[in-house]
Amino acid sequence: MPPAKKGPATSARKGQKTRRREKKNVPHGAAHIKSTFNNTIVTITDPQGNVIAWASSGHVGFKGSRKSTPFAAQLAAENAARKAQDHGVRKVDVFVKGPGSGRETAIRSLQAAGLEVGAISDVTPQPHNGVRPPKRRRV
């Protein structure tokens, strides 16, 4: 005999409330593009730094070495821009970090998606002779 059902099936755990995502109305925000050699992450925040929308090359559906392509960065930026526009974002200041190949493509696709791009600044961290870098690759 199968065990008796205890109650309605819910996705949330017992005693835990599910938070519904409220629609923010933020006309001006900041787009943070982190472009590494392996991936590109686009995060759109409000002026205080609270995340409104984000997307990455892996989140969009690319795996492995295809995540590091400019096309993957383009799709990630379009995806994040679409989500941000649902929250009312119309203008963004862009902060680019990292040496990856998807930097310029992500900025261009933010503009193409309908966001007005204000200032573009490079915030790549530069070491003042910090830790020792990894040894050279010999291929």
Curated annotation (Swiss-Prot):
Pfam families with a match to the protein in the record: Ribosomal_S11
Annotated Gene Ontology cellular components are:
cytosolic small ribosomal subunit; plasma membrane
Q: How does it assemble?
A: Part of the 30S ribosomal subunit. Interacts with proteins S7 and S18. Binds to IF-3.
UniProt-listed SUPFAM superfamilies? Translational machinery components
Name the job this protein performs.
Located on the platform of the 30S subunit, it bridges several disparate RNA helices of the 16S rRNA. Forms part of the Shine-Dalgarno cleft in the 70S ribosome.
Gene name for this UniProt entry: rpsK
What is the protein's species of origin?
Mycobacterium tuberculosis (strain ATCC 25618 / H37Rv)
InterPro entries of this UniProt entry?
Ribosomal_uS11, Ribosomal_uS11_bac-type, Ribosomal_uS11_CS, Ribosomal_uS11_sf
Q: Where is this region: Disordered?
A: 1-33, 118-139
Name-wise, this protein is: Small ribosomal subunit protein uS11
The UniProt similarity line reads: Belongs to the universal ribosomal protein uS11 family.
The alphabetized UniProt keywords are: Ribonucleoprotein, Ribosomal protein, RNA-binding, rRNA-binding
What GO terms describe the biological role, i.e. biological process, of this protein?
translation
Q: Composition bias, kind Basic residues: at what positions? A: 14-23
Gene Ontology molecular functions: rRNA binding; structural constituent of ribosome
